């Protein structure tokens, strides 16, 4: 026995309408606090449910829900949630007969849809599932509960709402929060100039919006979250300011006072990202390339959400040692602070000396800056194992060398007659190292002069020039892929994959497998 009835929403195909956005604007007028898109999506779900209930109440005006436990009178109009919300009138009442149940009534109801009369128990003394219905939802409409809707369709609704908010000129986004543009606290040019002056006095920053607000004298009757949001929104629009806080934290810095290496990629790191097909390399070379942690190996942007690691060990490479940087890759990004912005300011800590100093994650160019003095203080060489470890204190990253300093026979490189020459010599190494990667540079200035001549030349030409000298260091005349990568990057910036591909077709070079090549002078 059915009737025309406002049924449940089709949440699977729900579309966000202008009326929805207008309703959210009105909600902000009632409660002027910034909200996340999840909070707004949940508000929207509750609003849609309220609309369904209001339509049902209107359709059922003058009726009451049928529940077996209730008492009814002849002439009362009832609706039945378990029967598609059919409506009928009580036309008769009689005593019920069942000794096992006890006294109860039986009501006769004539349904308005087709005039049929059916009987139902009333004043029923035992528990019954229909007594538990809230009246406006049927027994199969659990999806009309906000949490059930969110669990099943919440992410889809949230994504749709976010897309509509991003396209709407009426809303402003700061971080993961939203607020109507028309309700923002007004900040004029004088306020922004004052922020610039405050940051200038603090060496460019970083300062939080809460630290900046006392200097601006915004209306005190405006809630603090709205003042913070409005200030952040104004600073985002002004190119003088850079938001450099890690995820979940807003910190502002004067862009003109950021280190040059944060604003521009250091020359030693400039190279072409790899965009080829790794299938041309065997499994061993693909594994070695992945383990090298070269930021140019992966052309995709590094984003938050990589997971977290307490510690990451990186095998140092010469371009980063010269630049005072470390690579930002999918692996190292698990320990470095990441956020929604392209530049993130944090602090390095040397647990040996206790010293702290500024560090910068430069996410769009995939490196971390701020290590030059530390590298020089410990005389870190290409191939040394550098450990980055999270500190219990937020925004602090500890950097150390693995192991103790020791003297050993190692590869040493020097410049001679415009070329690099390698030999095995005893040198003091500041910590543990990867034997296949270690190359000690005694005279960085001499290599710098060679770098200016080689930096734009083909990788193939440099590899061919380096191989004979490297091969003479082993009795077998072999060169490992890690060794060659470190050697070539002394003068030419390249990720490992294109270098390995060139090696596979280089005359005089025989690939033995497992990452080893043998140099054969007679075939070169």
Name every feature range the model reports, one short phrase each.
Residues 5, 11, 23-78, 135-150:
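Mixed-charge, Lys/Arg-rich low-complexity intrinsically disordered regions
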Residues 6-18, 22, 113-158:
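Intrinsically disordered, low-complexity, charged/polar segments
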Residues 65-91, 215, 343, 384-385:
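Short coil-to-beta transition motif at edge beta-strands of beta-rich domains
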Residues 181-210, 215-219, 234-236, 448-478, ...:
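Positively charged, polyanion-binding regions of nucleic-acid-associated proteins
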Residues 85-98, 398-402:
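Short beta-strand-centered aromatic/proline hotspots
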Residues 162-193, 223-283, 498-524:
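Charged low-complexity interaction tracts in eukaryotic proteins
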